Each structure stands twice: as C-alpha cells, then as structure tokens.
Design a protein with these regions (language model features):
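Non-catalytic accessory segments flanking enzyme active sites
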Residues: 32, 54-55, 107-108, 257-260, ...
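Beta-strand-rich domains and repeat architectures in extracellular enzymes and scaffolds
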Residues: 18-58, 105-114, 328-332
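Short loop/turn segments that connect beta-strands within beta-propeller blades
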Residues: 62-65, 130-134, 174-177, 303-306, ...
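Residue-level detector of Asp-centered blade-edge/turn motifs that repeat once per structural unit
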Residues: 37-38, 113-114, 156-157, 251-252, ...
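Predominantly five- to eight-bladed beta-propeller fold
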Residues: 3, 60-108, 177-210, 214-247, ...
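Beta-propeller domains
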Residues: 259-456
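Structural motif
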Residues: 51-58, 125-127, 167-173, 265-271, ...
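Hydrophobic beta-strand positions that form the internal "hydrophobic ladder"
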Residues: 42-43, 118, 158-161, 253-256, ...
C-alpha cells in the first residue's frame, strides 16, 4: 500500500510537466476522424508517440472479409526534412490558436466527395495525397504573391484546390499537376488568383473577367495593410462561434462562396511571443466588448473551367442581406442539389435569420475563352475573352430570401451543423424551445426532437434521420422513457455525458453510444467512426465500424440482408496517461442545482 501511494504521489508531482510535454495527453492519440466512401475507409490523424507533436495522416481500412488495417498515408518527416522545426505563417498560427490546436505536422486535411484525394499543408507547404495510387506529392508554390498557403480545401470533384493567402483567393488546377511523381511538383500555370481583397469596398473582388490578374493584384497591393482579409473567418467567428472557414465550395465544384472582412474599425492589440522575446510584438485586430466588429461581406463566385479542368475566369455576385441588423455570419451550409444556407445573427445574438442564397440558372452560360484568331488580312490576332452569363430579370445570383427567423430575449444558442437541408429538400434548424426548456431541432419549422434531449451538435443529416450529439436533462426525460440500452446506467446519461444518437423525423430515436462520456461520430455509407472517452477512463478511444456481409458455415456467400455483421476495429492509441486516477465526486450545487465536480 505504501509503495502504491508513493507511486501515486510521484505521478501527481510529475503531472504538470507531463501534461505540458504531451499537449494535455493528446500526443499519440488518434483524432480528426472522417469516414469516407462506402464507410470501409476512415481517415484520421495521429503522431507516433506520447510526446511526439508531429502528426501524420492515416487511414483505417475494413476489408470485405472483415480484415482490418491501419495505413500510413503521409508522414511529415518523410515529406519534409524540416518537419520537426515548424515554421508556419502568422495567420495560420492565429487560426490554430482560435481552434486550440497545439500540434504540428499535418493538423488538418480536406478530402474530396469520393474520398480519393486529400489536400493538406505542412509548414505552410501544400501537399496532395492520391489514396488509390498511394502517392503523396508536394505542390510547390513559388511565386510570392501566391503565399502563404492558408486553409486549403479540395473541390468535391477532386480536380481543384482552393486556398487563401489572406490577400488573394487562389485556385490550383490539379489537371496541370503531374500524377507521376511523389517529389515536389512546380504548380506553374496551374495556379490562378480568382479573387482578392478590395481597395475601398467589397463590391469588386473577383478576378478580371478577361482572365488576367492585373486588377486583382493591383487592388491587393493598394489595400490597407492587413485591414481587409479574404477567405478567412474573422476573429469573432473563430473565437466565439467555432466557425474557422472563410470560403466554401459548392457540391458541384462550380461555385465558391467566400468571405471578405474589413477589420479596420476593431481595436489593435500587440501580442508578444513569450517563447521568443527577440521577436517584435505582432499587431492583431481584436473586437473588444462594446466596440465595433469587423465588417463582413459574402460573395458568390461563379467559376469557369475549360474541358481540361483549367480555370479561365470567374464572375462575382455580391450576397445581399441586412448586414446592419445582422452583422454576424454565424454559419454557412451547402447541400447537393440545393441553394446555400446562411445563418446570420444580430449583435446581441437574440435574433437570427436563416437565409437561402439564390444561385440562379443563367439563360446564357459562361463559356470558355477564344484565344487568338486570324483577321481578314491573314494576320494572327491575340485575344482573350469569355462569354459573360446572362440571367432573366429577378434571377440574378446573390439575392437572399428569409426561410426562418428565431428570437430569444436571453440568448440564441448556436448549434453546430445547423441550418441544413435534407437531401430531399426539408429544412433542419435549431430551436431554443423555452416552453420545453430544451434545445431542439425542427424540420420545416416543426420540432421533432424529444423534450429533455438537449441537442448540442448536428453531425449528419439524411432523409431518414439526423445524427447528433445530445445531453439529457433527467427532470424532463425520465429514466423510464429511455431506450433499453441506456437503462442500466440511466443516471449517468445526463448533463455530464455528450452522447451520439440518431433521431428520426417522427421523434423516435436510438442511442449509438452506450457508455456515458464525451463522444462524436462520422459516418459514410455502411460505416462510421466513433471517437471519445468514457467517464471511467482517461484514454481517448476511436473505433472504426462497418457492416460487412458474412458467409455461412460452408463458406458460401449469403446475399440476405440479415446476414450482415458489424466489424469493430479499434484504432491504436499511443498517448500517455496521467499515471493516477483522481477521486471525483459529482454534486449538485446552488439554487439551480448545477452540476459540479469535487476532486
């Protein structure tokens, strides 16, 4: 007993240093999982050990026979010699701070709709992984005006990568980048500026319609230094609303919605680097309470690509809403086959509007340029022009219409993943139901989630159900009304537990996580990835699950739908543990009986 106590005391003494070296015990743990394709594959990030901060890109695979494997897709140390000596742009550092990202290497990724290509950066350099070919190659961005590479997003069709420099929105045509080498490939003519920050306002941010970039570059050069940004989320969105993106591809890869904002009215703070006192303090715009916020604009950019998939020009349409009354752009959603959705809020966050952005069907579509012809004298004439799309009156893109409005005299909670369309066109929104004392979901304005099941995040929306993270309020949803799988530990499924459930539009629901804890999920096809931890274990858990067909005792294939079995593949976790288990007791305190933990 004495030796055990001494060991625990040693672990407690070592805890502060160990927590710092392991980035709060996250190094070596799998994270950022996403199920792709038919669900038999799942991407995730993980470093090699408990004190290794350099994160690699991995893929979990479940075969048709139920065999499982973990495949290393991209190792920063293999791709970049100085991967350990992280050197990322200042704007990227700021974005990571808002996202509470402390790792290095590959800290985020973007995958196309089919799950075949993945884009990411390492130390500000752009890379592309072709999963089927098993090749990862660097895309060298050499021109200074095309740097830094921030927040790259691959198009849903996998043919383009869009990123922002903060000053320019840049397109990379992957058709012009070689598929035959894993060495760094010079992007060359594959890179085009498609939009830039404006000089005085946000009315003219698109690239010139004749395909040149002179005006865009000129506007950016003359803009106020650092006041206007393009393709980035403003501080309030990232820090307070958990919105970190500043541009969004359309599902058909033909459009991009992008944000521009003017931060010149915000206060300037000067942030020093405590790790390097020789560096001068950096100026950062910060929206202090009771002072002006950034002035946020949104633009719909119609993209023109030729038959080879190469960008030749774009047409910009201002997205119009009452920006004076609703200054916060809280969320953007774009479902295949439907118009993009916006959620905008007023300054006090007591009123919001759900808006549909009109994209429009042109009566004359944009066409590829005619590049050069011969005049009457037989002389070659250099030209470059594109056909500008024409729209019927009232069909011009960029106008918005209000689909729903919500009000709450106290506060409107933001529910991540809302608003969203179902594939068949029904509108799913969040609702602060004060009468039911519940954060609920509505479909076409009608609440359908149960009273007492507090919706915290929407993970996926289908025609049949909504996948979401919930907390239960026992006073509103008693144990007797819970599904069978929660009956044995009903008391622990309360405000302390973030559970994943499937809720159908008729109100029926079923839990998909059974152990009380903090959970999330990504699903695709017949597969999913569950990530989280229970209350009785400090270790992060990740499981890749997939329904596969089984065979009968003779080995013959069985086609019946009821002969499917669930394969559960645990993803390895190399993270450190604290070395001791704190003695925690939960109590209810105060007039409102709030949950508290006594350690």
């Amino acid at each position: 007993m004495v030796g055990r106590l001494e060991g625990m005391n040693d672990a407690i003494d070592e805890f502060p240093g160990l927590k710092a070296r392991t980035l709060r015990f996250t190094c070596g743990a799998p994270r950022s999982a996403r199920a792709i394709g038919d669900g038999s594959r799942a991407l995730f990030l993980r470093s090699d050990g408990p004190e290794d901060t350099v994160t690699s890109l991995w893929m979990s695979v479940i075969g048709s026979d139920g065999d499982t494997d973990e495949i290393l897709l991209a190792d920063p140390r293999t791709l970049l010699a100085d991967a350990d000596a992280e050197d990322v742009p200042a704007e990227e550092k700021a974005r990571r701070e808002r996202a509470r990202e402390g790792g290095s290497g590959i800290v985020g990724y973007s995958v196309d709709a089919a799950g075949n290509r993945v884009a990411f950066t390492i130390n500000g350099q752009l890379f592309l992984t072709d999963i089927a070919a098993g090749v990862t190659r660097g895309i060298a961005i050499d021109e200074p005006e095309f740097k830094p590479v921030l927040n790259p997003r691959i198009s849903p069709d996998g043919r383009h990568i869009m990123y922002t420099t903060g000053t320019y929105l840049v397109d990379v045509d992957l058709a012009d980048v070689s598929d035959t080498t894993d060495a760094a490939e010079d992007a060359g003519d594959a890179v085009s500026i498609v939009a830039s920050v404006p000089q005085d306002d946000a009315d003219d941010v698109a690239d010139t319609q004749d395909g040149t970039q002179d005006d865009a570059q000129s506007d950016a050069a003359e803009s106020q230094a650092g006041e206007w940004k393009i393709g980035l989320a403003e501080f309030a969105a990232g820090e307070e609303m958990d919105r970190y993106d500043g541009f969004w591809w359309s599902p058909d890869s033909k459009y991009v919605l992008f944000e521009t904002f003017d931060a010149s009215h915000e206060q300037t703070w000067y942030i020093a680097d405590p790790a390097d006192p020789t560096k001068p303090a950096q100026a950062r715009r910060y929206p202090q309470a009771m002072t002006a916020n950034a002035d946020v604009h949104l633009t719909l950019l119609e993209l023109g690509y030729d038959t080879d998939g190469c960008y030749y020009g774009g047409i910009a349409h201002n997205v119009e809403w009452d920006r004076e009354s609703y200054e916060y752009l809280a969320a953007v959603s774009w479902t295949e086959g439907h118009e993009p959705l916006l959620l905008v809020q007023d300054r006090l966050q007591q009123h919001d509007q759900v808006l549909a952005v009109h994209v429009g069907e042109p009566i004359v579509t944009m066409s590829a340029p005619e590049n050069g012809f011969t005049d009457e004298d037989g002389s070659e004439v250099e030209t470059f022009s594109i056909a500008i799309p024409e729209y019927a009156p009232g069909e011009e893109p960029g106008t918005t219409r209000v689909l729903e409005e919500h009000s709450n005299d106290c506060w409107l909670d933001l529910i991540a993943g809302t608003p969203a369309y179902t594939p068949d066109g029904r509108l799913v929104c969040a609702m602060n139901d004060m009468d039911a004392d519940t954060n609920r979901l509505t479909v076409d304005g009608t609440p359908f989630t149960p009273k007492g099941l507090q919706v915290r995040e929407v993970l996926d929306v289908t025609d049949n159900d909504v996948l979401c993270v919930v907390q239960r309020t026992p006073e509103l949803l008693p144990a007797a009304d819970l599904p069978f799988l929660w009956q044995s530990n009903a008391d622990d499924h309360d405000a302390r537990s973030f559970d994943v459930v499937s809720i159908r539009y008729d109100g029926d629901w079923e839990p998909l996580t059974y152990v009380p804890g903090q959970w999330t999920m990504s699903r695709a096809g017949d597969g999913c990835v569950v990530t989280g931890r229970g209350m009785d274990d400090a270790a992060m858990q990740m499981q890749h699950c997939m329904n596969v067909r089984t065979t009968d005792g003779d080995g013959d294939g069985v086609d019946a739908a009821d002969m499917m079995s669930m394969v559960v593949s645990p993803i390895e976790n190399h993270a450190e543990t604290p070395g001791f288990m704190p003695n925690v007791r939960f109590v209810r305190l105060g007039e409102r009986a709030l949950y508290a933990a006594v350690i």
